[in-house]
Curated annotation (Swiss-Prot):
Keywords: Arginine metabolism, Cytoplasm, Transferase. Pathway: Amino-acid degradation; L-arginine degradation via ADI pathway; carbamoyl phosphate from L-arginine: step 2/2. Its EC number is 2.1.3.3. It comes from Bacillus thuringiensis subsp. konkukian (strain 97-27). It catalyses: carbamoyl phosphate + L-ornithine = L-citrulline + phosphate + H(+). This is Ornithine carbamoyltransferase, catabolic. It comes from the Bacteria.
Length: 332
C-alpha cells in the first residue's frame, strides 16, 4: 500500500486524465491488496449494504461479470439494467435518469457509447459514477492492464508498452494517456489514417514527452516490454470491416513481431475478445468472407508463454473492486 492514502471518497471514475499519478498507483496498490484478500478468503465488505446500478447500453461479458462479482465481494447489491431497461435520452433525458438513479442507488456504473452520457450521469446523480467503457475512454480496462504489467514486468516506470492496431479507439486512448501518467514509454503503432486524435496525443505528452506515434512496426516494437492489441473493428463499426482488414494486416501480432522486440520476456496483452482462431461463429464468418483464420493476433502468440491475457481479464475484477471501494467504501 502507498504510505499516504488519497481521499477519493465520492469521486467518479470517468477517465485516467482526472487522476494524479499517485491516485492511479493507489488504485493499483489497493487492487493488489484486495486480490490477495480474495485469494486467501479474507472478507473485505467495504460496500456493505450499498446498492449499485450497472447500466449497460453496450453488451459485455468481462465488464458485467467483473462489476457484478466485485459488488458481491464488497458486500454491495448490484442491479443490472440493460439497453432494454433504460431510456437514456429516448423517453427520459440522461439528466432526469441520473437524478432518479441517484435517489435510489449509492453508485452507478455505465457502459455505452457517448462519453457525454457518463459525464452527465456523474454531474447529475450525486453519487460516484464509474465508466465501464465509452467511445472515448476505457479506464477500468487500463487499470487492469497496468496491474498485469506491474505483476509480470515488475514495474511501470519507463516500461515500453507498444499498442499495435486501431490507434483511435478507446483502449488506445486510455493506454496512451494512462500509461503516460504513470511514467511508461507508450508507443502507438498504426497506419497514419488511424493515428490517435491530436488532442489525445497532446494530453499524453503533458505527462511524458517520450510518447511515440508511428506507422513503422520495427521502430515501434524494438526492445518492447509489452505488445498490446485489440480487435480491428470496434462494436458499431462493422461496415468498415473489409477496409480495416486490408489496412491492418501488416500490424497483426505474430511470432515474427514478438521476436523483433529482441526481448525474450516480452508479454502480450489483449482486452478480449480476440479473433485468433475460427472457434466462434464470428471467426467462421470472417474466414468464409476473407479467408482469414486469425486476425489481430495469431493463435500461436495468443497461446504462447508471452500471453498474459487471462491474468489481465481476471484483473478487471480486482481493479474495478479497488475503484468502487476507494470512491464509495468505508476504507478507514
Amino acid at each position: 500500500m502507498l504510505m499516504t492514502r488519497p481521499n477519493l471518497k465520492g469521486r467518479s471514475f470517468l477517465a485516467e486524465k482526472d487522476f494524479t499519478p499517485e491516485e492511479l498507483l493507489y488504485f493499483l496498490d489497493l487492487a493488489a491488496e484486495l486480490k490477495e484478500k480474495k485469494k486467501n478468503g479474507i472478507p473485505h465488505h467495504y460496500l456493505e449494504g450499498k446498492n449499485v446500478a450497472l447500466l449497460f447500453e453496450k453488451t459485455s461479458t468481462r465488464t458485467r461479470c467483473a462489476f457484478t462479482v466485485a459488488c458481491t465481494d464488497l458486500g454491495a447489491n448490484p442491479e443490472y439494467l440493460g439497453k432494454g431497461d433504460i431510456q437514456l435520452g429516448k423517453k427520459e433525458s440522461v439528466e432526469d435518469t441520473a437524478k432518479v438513479l441517484g435517489r435510489m442507488f449509492d453508485g452507478i456504473e455505465f457502459r455505452g457509447f457517448n462519453h457525454e452520457t457518463v459525464e452527465s450521469l456523474a454531474q447529475n446523480s450525486g453519487v460516484p459514477v464509474w465508466n465501464g467503457l465509452t467511445d472515448m475512454w476505457h479506464p477500468t480496462q487500463t487499470l487492469a492492464d497496468l496491474l498485469t504489467i506491474r505483476e509480470h514486468v515488475g514495474k511501470l516506470k519507463n516500461v515500453k508498452l507498444v499498442y499495435v492496431g486501431d490507434g483511435r479507439n478507446n483502449v488506445a486512448n486510455s493506454l496512451l494517456v494512462g500509461g503516460a501518467i504513470v511514467g511508461m514509454d507508450v508507443r502507438i503503432c498504426t497506419p497514419e489514417s488511424l493515428w490517435p486524435a491530436q488532442e489525445v496525443i497532446d494530453l499524453a505528452k503533458k505527462y511524458n514527452e517520450q510518447v511515440m506515434i508511428t506507422s513503422n512496426v520495427e521502430e515501434a516494437v524494438a526492445s518492447a516490454d509489452v505488445i498490446y492489441t485489440d480487435v480491428w473493428v470496434s462494436m458499431g463499426e462493422e461496415e468498415k470491416f473489409a477496409e480495416r482488414v486490408e489496412l491492418l494486416k501488416p500490424y497483426q501480432v505474430n511470432m515474427k513481431m514478438i521476436k523483433e522486440t529482441g526481448n525474450k520476456n516480452v508479454i502480450f496483452l489483449h482486452c478480449l475478445p480476440a479473433f485468433h482462431d475460427v472457434e466462434t461463429m464470428y471467426g467462421e464468418e470472417v474466414y468464409e468472407k476473407y479467408g482469414l483464420k486469425e486476425m489481430e493476433v495469431t493463435d500461436e502468440v495468443f497461446r504462447s508463454k508471452h500471453s498474459k491475457v487471462f491474468d489481465q481479464a481476471e484483473n478487471r475484477m480486482h481493479t474495478i473492486k479497488a475503484v468502487m471501494a476507494a470512491t464509495l467504501g468505508n476504507m478507514e
